[in-house]
């Protein structure tokens, strides 16, 4: 009588948990062989529950079938094929013995027509072989099945591949599960629900934890002696991992370990589906890169953690990467199965590790290995996801190394010579004068070993670069297609680094996380692409997450061993999981008594920004209790924070929901999308009065970066006095900065104002001189009487989310104030108050070719929300330095901080040594749309950026500026090569008067950015500021050059204009800077950083926005002169090395040091030698509010010292 196969039935095809096995399902329609695990055998189960089968008393008997019951014609005998069978599991540590046998394979006839040749679901994943026949699947590789004796087939399958209802150990050491059986530990009991899968060292069952009624997965290890040692290693590794945050580092959470009937049982969280089953469910179709990226990021994060612990997973493959919850958390994955894991110090060269398709060359060749083998496996996994088929599906190790060598070239000679197993696959060529290794031909290998080589590849590539051409999506076009091609280039670049044959040169998990494919900085060139937006949305799943039962206190259960009486064989060991701090912001931010947190009153959270940080999340980036000592409190209001947690420990931005453009104030709340260059949570702020309370210790030692808080006033008849609170930053190394508070600091801001809280992430840049650089904040009000609305300009740019890469540097997060999150913050306060027209019009104008505005001033939009600098060791995204020529009417000016020290420099200095007589002023001219325009100038100093050339968006080429003499600075026909190497970017004005269409057209708006060839400057000095149709950039001739660029305009003089004669010599003449007699604040920047940005932003005319930069939005209050305030305020943050001779020449420094960048301040604001006291209404009636440490050379109070103008005879 034929033996009956009794198997358990899972509820669905995709149900699996902590298992590395593929399922062989036996269904009436045919056999669906979905592969197998790293073990040498399969298991079978069925979805059908025949009602005619008998029921066992204590177990549920299912899927009973007789092989003889099948028609003999339904059994197809495959031709005899030679196979290699490794009797011992590869990763068991025991020696593998190879035997050769003729294996008869068995398949169901109806399955032949269902499987495509390339979709062989019965892929062997470790030591087994793949039959080359397209539809015949190998079921067993044990002694040949005797087809003439069906009972033998059933018996063999019963003992090796199927679980029965008997609850006893098999000869292989597997525990025989019984459904509804109770597995008991010392503290919990688990009921077996169903069989999930079989792995190398045991099997996995889905169980029900009775005490908590939760579903868990229990891995029951074999009790065979050969697996005992590896089982102990797995238990010890899981015990070590249990002290880490499993959700943060993306590996399976383990609960406890216990003994049941002499079998070690490991309890894990229940996961849904592995990647192989997911691919199979989708018919092995290629996975788009936007889905591969989050999987890669999460697995690389897990490998990064394992590497830091000195652990090797050694069996990374799609089967061991589990989808946590495909429905609610798409592409949220975790790494499972540490049964093959080992410590790097205990790695043995001769050990068989890894499934063959994902086996690193050093394992195949018998070389010493380390954690780098996991990176090779991960590269093979992401290649398989991309192709839908394994990249190197070798049927044997020879085929595996042959595939690798054909695509990537032979391993280096020194690797082949050092390998202990090299001679199995390579020969030395005796015909050459010196011995070189040569791969054996398939015939030679077959002759030596008797193993026939097979071809199982779906794609055969001559090199990995060819992968970019396959499976190109046909539904993408335009910018989406350009973004996809750019994404593929970065993907291939990373893949080649992961699949480097030499393990010493292979990319590490940390570098993988910082690669552009993961950080997506290359996609910033396509901000308007829906495809790119979906890429960023998919990476949301990579945010740090905290489990619901994590508590504030780290409660660690000890790893205990419960010694039971001799009558019991149970051994219980409890895995302790790190219960990290709950990021429940309401509770965390309320705990300001110990570590003062920032309590922000937020409401109407209709401004969304992607909370994705595209770098690794090291544990050292966690909040440091000694750092978060003080905070900023915005009151009154409830302690209501965003509903989401703050996984990246970032600062919040309090952003105004709307900026009124009418003549009277309004309370309408309308969320305004903000494009920031830093991924931080954005929430709108209600326009209610918000007092700012700044605690005295808000600045800590080494903190040099201010956080600017600006208040924007709507149109109201009267405005209460505003208070600017600049803090002295005496940033000498080792000296804490001091803040002197006055009554002005603690007075409430007036009602109806809107606050912008700008966090700073600039100190995260590595290599930045933090202790000697200050980014000051200046408020420069100019007279303005226009009623022109700014909504038109704002609408010129489409509003979308901009994302950036913020690489949190742990070394830079130690001495900075945090808002309960370890985000480095310093606070400086500045208010923007509009001032009525008070200055007289200029006495003369330049000749214009078209009607222009009566006055021209260099201005910056008030309340510009400046993008933060996102940085990683590989890329620094620049931000904006905003200067604006505004025509006809004047508006208050803010020159906020340049957010990034290593970014562009706007330098204003007087070259006292080689000053020439002709001084240049900013031109007051028009382009073609309107007067009363507001433009932005961004100066970047990286000459090697090709962002503008690769941009899919056109940039307008402007005609040259006209100077005082009416001559052109440069003709419109001049090529970009004639320009200078650096680049200045100006956002175009949308309304300018239509000027001459000839070459004499004047430009006050956009000067499109373009990569221009650097031109050597005269005598190694500064080549000045050259304005060309294609580039307007500050060129530094030498490492110590500092550029003159005037940022202000004397209202008493004529409208400033710039002119420069260009000769045939491409080297520009030396340009002089007109420096107004104004007080100036030194800006400190860094130029010589090796981490200087290589990809710089560039602006394009509206509506086509720059691909690599965030949108600049104008959050401006109405511009009617009747509703403007009459006073303004100024907040200066000075660096100690700032010279008091602000208008004088500044000492140049080596390129490795910071450069002084003095920024001029409008004459209507500060007292200076040339400005009458009546022109400046001092806003702070009484006491000085700037405190200074001893030894500082900066000003310590109002009024500021007058500018030394003795050097400027022309003023």
From Swiss-Prot:
Q: Which Pfam families match?
A: Pkinase
Report where the covalent cross-link Glycyl lysine isopeptide (Lys-Gly) (interchain with G-Cter in SUMO) sits. Answer: 25, 1204
**BP term (GO), one:** cell population proliferation
Q: Crosslink Glycyl lysine isopeptide (Lys-Gly) (interchain with G-Cter in SUMO2) sits at which residues?
A: 25, 120, 124, 991
What domain of life is recorded for the organism? Answer: Eukaryota
The free-text function statement in the UniProt record for this protein reads: Serine/threonine-protein kinase involved in transcription regulation and TNF-mediated cellular apoptosis. Plays a role as a corepressor for homeodomain transcription factors. Phosphorylates DAXX and MYB. Phosphorylates DAXX in response to stress, and mediates its translocation from the nucleus to the cytoplasm. Inactivates MYB transcription factor activity by phosphorylation. Prevents MAP3K5-JNK activation in the absence of TNF. TNF triggers its translocation to the cytoplasm in response to stress stimuli, thus activating nuclear MAP3K5-JNK by derepression and promoting apoptosis.
Summary of subunit composition and partner proteins: Interacts with Nkx1-2, Nkx2-5, MYB, PARK7, DAXX and p53/TP53. Part of a cytoplasmic complex made of HIPK1, DAB2IP and MAP3K5 in response to TNF. This complex formation promotes MAP3K5-JNK activation and subsequent apoptosis.
- Per the Swiss-Prot or TrEMBL record, the active site comprises 315
Report the PROSITE patterns cross-referenced here.
Answer: PROTEIN_KINASE_ATP, PROTEIN_KINASE_DOM, PROTEIN_KINASE_ST
Q: What is this protein called?
A: Homeodomain-interacting protein kinase 1
- Give the UniProt family note: Belongs to the protein kinase superfamily. CMGC Ser/Thr protein kinase family. HIPK subfamily.
Provide this UniProt record's keywords sorted from A to Z. Answer: ATP-binding, Cytoplasm, Isopeptide bond, Kinase, Nucleotide-binding, Nucleus, Phosphoprotein, Serine/threonine-protein kinase, Transcription, Transcription regulation, Transferase, Ubl conjugation
- Motif (Nuclear localization signal 1 (NLS1)) positions are 844-847
Molecular function (GO) terms for this protein are:
ATP binding; protein serine kinase activity; protein serine/threonine kinase activity; protein tyrosine kinase activity
Transmembrane spans: none
| Location(s) in or outside the cell | Nucleus; Cytoplasm; Nucleus speckle
Which segments show compositional bias classed as Low complexity? 1048-1064, 1096-1105
Where ATP binds, per the record, is at 196-204, 219
Which stretches of sequence are listed as region Required for localization to nuclear speckles?
891-998
Phosphoserine sites (modified residues):
872, 1201
Q: Which SUPFAM superfamilies match?
A: Protein kinase-like (PK-like) (SSF56112)
> What kind of modification does the protein receive after translation?
Phosphorylated and activated by JNK1. Autophosphorylated.
Q: Which residues form the Protein kinase domain?
A: 190-518
Q: Where is this region: Interaction with TP53?
A: 885-1094
